Amino acid sequence: MKVRPSVKTMCEHCKIIRRKGRVMVICSANPKHKQRQGK
C-alpha cells in the first residue's frame, strides 16, 4: 500500500473509498494501485 498526500485513481478499476476517516483507493484488477491518504 502506498501512503500519499494526494490519492488518485490509476486505472478504471480503482475506487476511492473512505474507511475510518481515511481516504483510500482500492483496485480489483491491480493490487499495486492500493493507496491511502495521510501520514
Curated annotation (Swiss-Prot):
PROSITE patterns: RIBOSOMAL_L36 (PS00828). The keyword Ribosomal protein applies. Coiled coil: none annotated. One of its GO terms (molecular function) is structural constituent of ribosome. GO terms for cellular component: cytoplasm; ribonucleoprotein complex; ribosome. Keywords: Ribonucleoprotein, Ribosomal protein. The keyword Ribosomal protein applies. GO terms for biological process: translation. It comes from the Bacteria. Belongs to the bacterial ribosomal protein bL36 family. This is Large ribosomal subunit protein bL36.
